[in-house]
């Protein structure tokens, strides 16, 4: 299953140690009662609580943000068939969003250009760092051509930082999707997470690590989304079915929504934006979820040939379908009806994401919008293929890509209007 790199990927480019916070907000502060507890271990809780269901259309109300803005609340607690109480994935992920937003609230609104920390270089290190970023640039140019061109529209510091994050995400994805994936064990992912801790502590292992280590020392990037992406890789090793959308949502957050949380501090929020920092992070998260859902819908046949089904099992059953129908690869009326609903949901996530793009800094809007428009068009191509995602791979043609770029540019010029 390929990972959607949000903010950064065009259709042709896509190829237990995570933390969950039980957080309490007070003004601009956030109190984290979790430390580094495992998100999976916190799925079962014994208390009640509100759920921030910011899901795509309207914010549902009762919760209060630091800005005084109210959101409606649905219950975050879900009963399992065994009668246990669990916390929904969206609530858990939203707690992570709150932490990221609190972390960068002051830094991102000071000036149009991010206030990057200027370190005093150790003699001899500048050349090595320059070489490290150059190598990240080469990796991006080779494996993510459209993304690479988009980054050239950014300021030099942002561009280098996004390259470093992209390369780390790609290396992480290749642990379970690359040529050596069959040899990867949970212990190997544990070692990769230990190495991540070293990167954030200023102890890089190699040149590519050094670029990321430099990036996180300059920008207000938190380690948690990186840990969560590694947890998504663990999930891919042990899980090939998802009982419902709540489980699938958590997987999509791990492998793609995390990239949005990593990227917002680099992209920057427009100083004139009246939107809350939380809402911009929500939009980034929504784009990651939308991209990964699109990957899943595009790659149904490819994943089935690997024995994997990344579709909600309960929704398949409600549509009168099963894994056997997917492995058979027949496009039936039942399949078309099922796919229409899945595509509709993915589009709602794209719509929510698009609302937040105008809140980004001016230099970041165009590449982000281009990525969004191109990825959303994959859904159109699935429809054009009569929902045959078993033997036909939906893709956006070069002429359609060229048409999308000026549209994205025009949209990027629209100033922020949200309050």
From Swiss-Prot:
Q: Species name for this entry? A: Capsicum annuum (Capsicum pepper)
Q: Which GO terms describe its cellular component?
A: chromoplast stroma
Pathway in which the depicted protein is active:
Carotenoid biosynthesis; phytoene biosynthesis; all-trans-phytoene from geranylgeranyl diphosphate: step 1/1
Provide the reaction this enzyme catalyses. 2 (2E,6E,10E)-geranylgeranyl diphosphate = 15-cis-phytoene + 2 diphosphate
What is the role of the protein in this entry?
Catalyzes the two steps reaction converting geranylgeranyl diphosphate to phytoene via prephytoene diphosphate.
What this protein is called in its record is Bifunctional 15-cis-phytoene synthase, chromoplastic
Query: Which Gene Ontology terms describe the biological processes this protein takes part in?
Result: carotenoid biosynthetic process
Q: Which cofactor does it need?
A: Mn(2+)
InterPro entries with a match to the protein in the record: Isoprenoid_synthase_dom_sf, Squ/phyt_synthse, Squalene/phytoene_synthase_CS, Trans_IPPS_bact-type, Trans_IPPS_HH
What the entry lists under Gene3D superfamilies is as follows: Farnesyl Diphosphate Synthase
Comment on pH dependence: Optimum pH is 7.6.
- Miscellaneous: While the color of orange fruits is due either to the accumulation of beta-carotene, or due to only the accumulation of red and yellow carotenoids, all peppers studied have a wild type PSY1 enzyme.
In chain numbering, the transit peptide falls at 1-74
Which PROSITE patterns does the UniProt entry name for this protein? SQUALEN_PHYTOEN_SYN_1, SQUALEN_PHYTOEN_SYN_2
Tell me what controls its activity.
Inhibited by inorganic pyrophosphate and hydroxyphenylglyoxal.
Q: Where in the cell is it found?
A: Plastid, Chromoplast stroma
Q: Which UniProt keywords apply?
A: Carotenoid biosynthesis, Chromoplast, Isoprene biosynthesis, Plastid, Transferase, Transit peptide
Mostly located where? plastid
- Known EC number(s)? 2.5.1.32
Describe tissue expression: Expressed in fruits, at lower levels in leaves.
Q: How does it assemble?
A: Monomer.
**Which Pfam families does the entry link to?**
SQS_PSY
Concerning its family, UniProt says:
Belongs to the phytoene/squalene synthase family.
Source taxonomy lineage? Eukaryota, Viridiplantae, Streptophyta, Embryophyta, Tracheophyta
- Give any GO molecular function from the UniProt entry: geranylgeranyl diphosphate synthase activity
